[in-house]
Amino acid sequence: MLTRKQQELLLFIHERMKESGVPPSFDEMKDALDLASKSGIHRLITALEERGFIRRLPNRARALEVIKLPEAYSPSLQPRRGFSPSVIEGSLGKPPAVAAPAAAKPIADNGNSVSVPVMGRIAAGVPISAIQNNTHDIVVPADMLGSGEHYALEVKGDSMIDAGIFDGDTVIIRNGSTASPGDIVVALVDDEEATLKRFRRKGASIALEAANPAYETRIFGPDRVKVQGKLVGLIRRYH
């Protein structure tokens, strides 16, 4: 299965070659997918080549050949510029709604509770492709939130269990792009993978640290990681 960004790049190359017969340049691909650097395009092309969707033709500049398209190909699915928050496991292969999280809405109980949008499932484990999908709303105590915009994510995975975050929990996230060392954040890696990890700095690099010794800390250059919000609360259902 392709990630959202891999599929967007493949379809962008396919549509450009249909129009002009020439593959787009790396700069054009970077701009179309709203990536920070061309290194992200190189990684996506390598992944597509390894999966058998494209082929690089030797001894020719900008020489790419599309071998096949995804089974769920839709001509209306085009690269989109920016999305927030970035979450996982929603409607992969379908055009997502591109709506930012709304401010939490008070409900009719004297203002003691508010409704927060649940934007999908976040990986507390190996990062999965980042897409946006507002699935439903959840009611939380108003004093859990404070100021700012908030959204909720359902946790998938066990990499944060030592921080008390378990598979199936719902985390409440304050939307934002900054974090302090030690904060648990929603991090977007290479504009295509979203994960829930503890934020650290290692010199000029960013470390995404799990709270489970079975998972390694992942180190990235600062241009590869975007903070999408900080953990402010957690909800657990007992069955």
UniProtKB/Swiss-Prot annotation:
The record marks 124-125 as: Cleavage. Keywords: Autocatalytic cleavage, DNA damage, DNA repair, DNA replication, DNA-binding, Hydrolase, Repressor, SOS response, Transcription, Transcription regulation. It catalyses: Hydrolysis of Ala-|-Gly bond in repressor LexA. The active site is at 159 (for autocatalytic cleavage activity), 197 (for autocatalytic cleavage activity). The keyword DNA repair applies. It is an enzyme of class 3 (hydrolase). GO terms for biological process: DNA repair; DNA replication; negative regulation of DNA-templated transcription; proteolysis; SOS response. Belongs to the peptidase S24 family. HAMAP family: LexA. This is LexA repressor. It comes from Rhizobium etli (strain CIAT 652).
